[in-house]
Amino acid sequence: MNEFELIARYFSRPPRDTGFVAQAGGDDCALLNLGDRQLAVTTDLLVEGRHFLPEVDPAALGHKALAVNLSDLAAAGATPRCFFLALALPRLEPEWLDAFSAGLYALADAHDCVLAGGDTTRAAPVAQGEGPRTFCITAVGEVPAGQAHGRGGARPGDELWVSGSLGDAALALAHLLGEVALTPAALAQVRPRLERPQPRVALGEALRGLATACIDVSDGLAGDAAHIAARSGVQLDIDTAAVPLGTVLGAQPERLRLRCALAGGDDYELLFTAPPQRQAQVRAAAQAAGVAVSRIGRVRAGQGVHLLDAAGQPLVAQWRGYDHFAAGPSTAASGS
């Protein structure tokens, strides 16, 4: 049983129709009706050893803990308003917490997002020693009623787009885990993509009324594209040669490039669909948001995700996104 089957089996009971919950489960955010607005609500959990390495810079961790939630709001096209923080710590470390909170507040201030409450506790010890540091953030955003993006609106004929570049975060993690060896200069270029991802909030807002479906790429391009395909009841064809890569990843062997870009995760870019007649508007919206976007495929009738090479042929090796319950115990990738 993978994590999505777990959710579907145990935690997917249809909500009671009260008129308040407009969308619950299956998307990056829940949507709550509030007059002419909707509140977008998301929550993400970060566990030491699973989502981040113990030696991570605490300021970077504070940034990322909030960034992964703001990325979900961006995928919904919502403007961040506030967040709640719950944390479990094995011990009090004032200097560590000073740095963590500084990183957290710096990103919050950049998006006018207020810490509105939370909870703290001590992490229970485990057989190997101290329990892991654990952080859970719930973020709340706002979007005009009826303008939120979901995963279910893609239609045959739409084009598939992605923001920024993919795979740098996975490459940095592979180096930190000893799987590849990067030069210090190369690591300095890709490590911020792993530890300080930039949520594409401005782009998400700019795509209101343009994107037909949207998701943030947290678990890998192939896996997250599959969520759009399943939710929309369509097939996504991805031209892997068109997937944008950074210069460091682009210089790596092909198999490593594909693994990082298609299945690595931790990118926190926006993957979205839009009709071809909106191409100029999409590019203008991206330019206004200060983010590059690339067309990487198309939507067809059918189901699933088809990964194609430069000649338009299916890749021999297919790639899946990150799955918490399929990964080995040493995996430290994200998967929010």
Where in the sequence are the language-model features?
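Short, acidic (Asp/Glu-rich) active-site segment that either coordinates a divalent metal cofactor
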Residues: 40-43, 148-205
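A short, N-terminal amphipathic alpha-helix
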Residues: 65-76, 108
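Glycine-rich anion/phosphate-binding loops
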Residues: 21-23, 54-68, 92-102
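A generic local secondary-structure boundary/capping motif
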Residues: 19-21, 29-30, 105, 119-129, ...
